[in-house]
């Protein structure tokens, strides 16, 4: 049964025609419904290789219940089937049968799967463009031999149904179909077709225009009768199509426009054009032009710019117009009737035209003499296919007949070159032109070097230079391109006909030079299969290939093994050799280790295509094409992902115009290869039908923007017609360094206005560097930086530039020495010149390797190309990656003199010149040796890589062993000549002998000797490199480059990789997959274990694990042995190299080993699980050993079986642990080594349980909280670094919708959203979530509770970084009272910049950490440095995790904290970003954002700010629910509905809420309840308010009772849907300090519906308590109770005036009262401002709000005491403005009204200064002093004057508060009357004594903010109430008309009328108030439901 099921599945897979059907059939197995999505996702797939996950998956069905044995068997069978099927894809027979298309989930380029036996039917159902879609799916083979048109209709209908393709309805089409016999291709033809290089990568249109019928003769022209030909010409060019496919119509609109504006001049400049056979058709020029108008594709592909004519010409110099016309006819057919054109019919045969071949060739070659100076026919490299006999004929006749004097080199050569391209139809038309250039080879060779050899992405570029001596072994034109352009490569021996480029095409299969067709077919079928396998494997290789591509690109052609090996000068040459060897080994081994995992998926070779590597560096953050492309092939950008791409910036700059070089070449790179898979990438799998809609197209943009870029007047714009046309067809070319074509549009990046508009200097810099690449030695101009006028803007500048550019590429600029290796060398290096960091060094290699330069030239060279990197206008992101390029580019060291001569001292200049001369001499000496040895070694490497798949067989297994050893044997004699190496290695082997024995015992392999042999050969080389680098410092460039710690670590990584590769290459497939499942995901992290100090640290923590012996996976022991010997040997090298000599190194090692003499193998074996071991190593690899030793000390002081909670409590209570370490070690004590399996599965389908709302009442969260919660959830799902597929419309829209959801959640409370002016929603342009969050909130808003709640809800590690270690003194600001803050130690100035990881003895460090009192200052500084290092190393080890940095404002840069600040920034934003796997979320919090250093608020740092506000009541419920739920308690379902309890305010801030929660939970625990009900909340509120009766007593002052009753009554009457706080007779003593919780409640409820009428209602609420107290509480309170009552009244006054200020801020520019007649329905005249405030008023208001009170007090009060009288107003004003502290007014009610962050003053400066704590200042603008005023001044009050008639607002200052608002009508000014002192109104004050008492106090400063000024004054409260009454009485009497005109009257009128309204309201409800008072006194508590 099992075998039968297996076969059925195989058959079903083969016959699949639809991806949807495939997925449907697959998902029929319900237990594997999620298996598909997991299996084909890279990270999930890796997880699934874990056996434990499989055991869970296979033991459960989709419902989660444990299933029977059937499910397990079924899952195993399906897994085996999947593996076998993937193997079958790569099988050659499977390829030929072409029946398996895994299009749905494996987007494999389909042309790599099946042979090209495409027939008429397959191409019938689509038009040209939509052919791209059909490529994703082929019809089954049953349709191949069909000739019936009805069946064809069915085929087309099927295709149309699935893919929205276009069906041609023309009946003649079907007639023509039946006229031609359709035959099945023969197998040989299929093989040849597979072998055709034109098939490996499909070109742009992918239309099968010319590749349909294989059965015709490939040599002769297809015989087609004229009648049929005529019919084909008459077919409509634009077939019928559906409405959504209108793009093709726009194409022809553009073509019609072009044909009317562009003149076509047929030029016949060659005599050979007249050599036309008589029997050819004659057509005049006019017919030809008219014909072309019918077929405008012709001239679109062949418009070449002639410099002399300034027009577009069709160059067909060697053939007649008639022959061209015939070719055009064929091309027309290829477009109109693509199904009827024989591909082989285009094989241009000279015999078929009756032309004398000898005469023809002679004429053609001779005719080039006159035109060679005018232009070079480097034609658009069009896709071509020729026949062998034609080439042989041409070659033979060329050898016979061509004149020898045409070549400078008498040895005759033949040049045949062509390139993949867009068009496949006019191939022979271009082919003949290519042959013209055979004659003038020397002339074009350098041009081709400059252009075509940089075009390494053309896999099918054939550019062979063959000598006539080769004879029959001549290079066949169909072979894959060979870059054997140089003569010495063509001199290979006959046995060495395969030359490989090992680092680019790792397993590229080439056809050998012999013309054996069988070998040709075989190898080409392999090539096609290999390419297919490459893409299969790449689908799952997201960042396994990225490292390889990036590194290989930098140094891909520069491994010249013996370039500088000078055996006479070993030490110097070794540096050069190692710089290449190490980089090569690193690249090869990285690729090997990264590609091995896919051998068990893809058994074939894995060619790495050139285009993928170069696309890698062009990824732009906003470029949809590149994003789509890279996502489709599975690449991910790591270090360049935030970098502006060097050649392709974004959506706009990708439309660059073609860079037309009219002088020397004619658009040579316009039609470079566009790979088939790149086209497929546009057909997004999720949105296949809409991939061509107008929104995603450029057709409409082009057709509607003709004035900008299709203007025929400007030749530069016209030169971009072709490129713009192709850009219009949705394929913007990737501007590789090989594609020198800029796309010109209205946003052409060279335009100055665009650059200025963008305000990004990086654009100038990028393209400036690009042009510097072009103009290498004739540096015409530079565009680096600045806003220069570029030379490409106007027509008159084009000509000189063209001439200069053409001169650059003409060979007189190149050396004529005959040494062709120069060009090989230069061309090999060219592909990396687009990298501005590497470019200059490459030039150094190229120029120096050719000819020695003079001293002056060298100086000029350095000034030109070796400018300091700091001068390159690097952006932040580029500069960040600079070190990465420097580290990995070994060429930077060859001549690294980054500063020009003028900056160097004379001595240094001489040394550098001598050094350069030596380098030049070496370059000459080893030229010959390089030619023989280097490529010999490379060939061996290539053999090794080509046959790598053989290692699955025993034969290949043995062969590879020998080959591997043979490859390294060439290097061994060179390396083994150093005696130092021998001693070092012997030392290593001796000291690690026990480790080697253990390893040998564990392995028990017969190949042990082989491993030893390889190790002996390879290990010493790398160790020697480290030693020599440290001991030979003659070259400052090399030593500086390779001495950095990163490079040292990298060198050890190479050694490590080498050991792994030796084993893995020789291992069976199953074992490789097993090793990969455990090691591959951790491999990059394990590498850092090789640092020796960490080796010792690792031993300390292993005590924590119980001893558990088991036969573990012994491959890890290989790792561990390598770690052990590395740690032992390299520590000694480090110690001796660090300056202390060998003794120092040995001493340090021995001192460390003294106490910890434990073998690493034994320690690791303690850990039971292999995965646990790797996870443990990862989690602890970066921890500083000091903390680990302390932890080990903990383990020794407690029993081993204690649980972590006891350890944690011991840490908290132990005196032997320093406070600095305590907080950190608690986190460390609960360190988990790996995630649980349920967490891994949970991460795939996760839901937030706390997001549920079971309480049945409205519970909401703040938007910032929601965003953070979503962010944490996304991080848990490993999506933090997910690169969104920006060209996938569905994914983009999904992300944007999700982004809107998490960022713009409504904070609704039954009211509308905010009505602030211009309050728009934010929008992020970058499709990525922010990994850095800055949480801003006032003190008490609960930032720490929010972050801790998120950490509680996430299973990710939560690590707190305490920055108070960095502060050099006591804090000047109050810390957030709810944030964690330790005691702050005074650490003094930090000027010690020693190494952080200083090696100290263990005892010393423990003593330092546990006995702080014995520390010196230096030791304390060292510990401070150690502390931050310890924290961040743990963070990196624990990744992914959440970092919380509370009070980040403490980290401001000053002289003492700059070191810490640099450490923090470096750890957070440089180290973490280097690794693509980092998934760290950084959350910083502050309540003083102005103190946060701006460097931290940057796009790649804390780029998202979240403002946390005080909680609204629904948010309080949510928070309360969360706090309860996370502790295991649940709320009653309808708790907030019962008895109106839902409106109760639970706390004025988050701390109160937490305290209430704790109180309620404690009550629930005592009552043994797990559900919290209403009674528990009541009890908790009651107990919390009572405060256990210790600080609470009943209030004796009945005034406060009346105050509460009045406030509650007003709330109930006016705002029925708002919250009402319970009232009681109990009041805390603290209430006078904290203020009522109602303050912020009312304001924030108000904030959600900010309307004028709402403001009035709230204003009445705020005044209600005071009014009732004034009316009822007549008895004078005593002093103590007056304090509490006053605070409430004072807060009310603040809130009243705050509301008025809010109204002024919101509606300051509202209409005046007379303008509101049209708004009668919504007319609230009280709240209309007469006019907006002017800026001068704002400044004056700000100046009057805060004054440096110390200055005023000291300067002025002393003068008053001396009796000097009135001061000079001007002097006061100057002093005032010189000492102003800008801030909003202090009267804001304690930050409740507007938080200090949200409420800036009118100047936009937020409020921080608390500058007057203790002085009273009265502002007045009256010069004369009245009696009362004199009394005030004499009693110590200060009076001063600001500018006359400018300040309209004045005020009293109490100790930190205003008595009234400065704009209060107490102090308003009359505009129409003379100034009158406000204090002249005697009736305002009850009496003079009351006024004195109210406004005077002791002049001394109070000790705290809570010390009220009126405490020492008797009966102050009573007088205050009288003041209120008299104030209202006075306001009622002030009815002067001028009063109503003043700016401040609206406020006085509002307050007056509101007071009257409330008085009438309460007097009319006196009975109700009396009843409430009695009830309150009886019940002691009144809740809102009882008040109703």
UniProtKB/Swiss-Prot annotation:
It is found in: Plastid, Chloroplast stroma. GO terms for cellular component: chloroplast stroma. This is Protein Ycf2. It holds the Pfam family Ycf2. It comes from the Eukaryota. Belongs to the Ycf2 family. Residues 1377-1396 are annotated as: Disordered.
